[in-house]
Amino acid sequence: MSKKTVLITGASRGIGKAILESFNDDYFIVGTGTSESSIKSILDNIKSLDFNGDAFKLDLGDRSSIKELTTTLESKQIYPDILINNAGITRDNIMLRMQEDEWDNVIDVHLNGQYLLIKSFIKKMVKNRWGRIINISSTSAVLGNKGQANYAAAKAGIEAMSRSLARELGSRNINVNCVAPGFIETDMTKEISEGNEDLLASQIPLGRLGKPDEIAEVVSFLASDQANYITGQTIHVNGGLYM
């Protein structure tokens, strides 16, 4: 049986890196990053794990970059069976001061970019009558967060889009789900939580921030045959921050 191909965006660090490492050599792993150094990091990680795979540059806020990636993959006959939309950015500001580019950048990367990426790959999944699309959301989609109206709106949009896709694609054996992390120990949350770790932890019933591999384990489960009957869901992994 041929290996299934997994595409993970934002695979060089944090949750994306942990997701990559949660798979095994039964899969062909493709990771994306936004810089040459991140591509090298992904390739080094794939090699150290003794996986088969490759890495490519991708800026989800740049439509030409998305087109370049999909064209390159097609030329190499690489067709993702499992698409994991993990890459993301923050441009935090209260609405009163938020600039249009801060709003647009976050919506472009999280929502418009994912739409274009999914649209590029589902045709092959439909033809194969099998696929997995796993979108990384956030508790911000349901709780909101001061200074993150753009991020919360994008993540809520991703969850709504995923439910609609699950209805559209279910008859073709393509499952679409979201995983919504709470506060996880990553570079992105460090910017938010620096100096406030104890305060954040006090708001979480389990009393601590999560770890990237605790998100990755849920993602790899949703990508597996054990999750064949799960679609259209948002799985919250947040230590009880949102119930």
Where are these regions (language model features)?
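Conserved glycine-rich cofactor-binding loop
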Residues: 12-13
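Conserved glycine-rich Rossmann-like NAD(P)H-binding loop of the short-chain dehydrogenase/reductase
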Residues: 26-41
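Substrate-binding pocket helix/loop in short-chain dehydrogenase/reductase
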Residues: 94-95, 99-107, 189, 200
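C-terminal substrate-recognition "lid" of short-chain dehydrogenase/reductases
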Residues: 115, 122, 130, 208-237, ...
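Active-site helix of classical SDR
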Residues: 118, 154, 162
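Alpha-helical segment proximal to the catalytic Tyr-Lys
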Residues: 123, 167-171, 228
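Residue(s) in the substrate-gating loop at a strand-loop-helix junction
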Residues: 138
